[in-house]
Design a protein with these regions (language model features):
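Short non-domain terminal segments
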Residues: 6, 26-27, 85
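Active-site scaffold of zinc-dependent metalloenzymes
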Residues: 14-46, 56-60
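Post-HEXXH active-site segment of zinc metalloproteases
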Residues: 32-34, 42-43, 47, 59-90
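Glycine-centered secondary-structure boundary/capping sites
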Residues: 10-14, 62-63, 92
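Short intrinsically disordered terminal tails
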Residues: 1, 89-92
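Zn2+-dependent metallopeptidase catalytic core
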Residues: 1-17
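Histidine-centered divalent metal-coordination motifs
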Residues: 51, 55
Length: 92
């Protein structure tokens, strides 16, 4: 499952580094410089991982910083949705 997701994202030049996938945001402050990807147990599906790991790559590309404004957050979210849609269309 995760190998397929990582291979797809690599085609789009998204190479996630130093991350942990967790079902809870309780670990956020413990992570430090490591990206934390939150996926609820019932939501652990390929297309959701594509979306969330894409956000991790966006975070890496931005110098490990979250979106600095609502507009930036919205742009990142729209981009992640487009990447997820591409994955879903190719998976059919």
């Amino acid at each position: 499952m995760l190998e397929t997701v990582i291979a797809f994202l690599a085609l789009l030049n998204c190479h996630p580094e130093d991350y942990v996938i967790t079902p809870s945001n309780n670990t956020f402050y413990l992570a430090g410089d490591i990206g934390v990807i939150y996926v609820k147990p019932g939501m652990y599906k390929d297309h959701i991982l594509v979306h969330e790991i894409w956000h991790h790559c966006q975070w890496q590309w931005a110098g490990k910083k979250p979106a600095q404004s609502y507009d930036e957050w919205r742009r990142r979210e729209e981009e992640a949705m487009k990447v997820e849609d591409i994955f879903l269309n190719l998976s059919q």
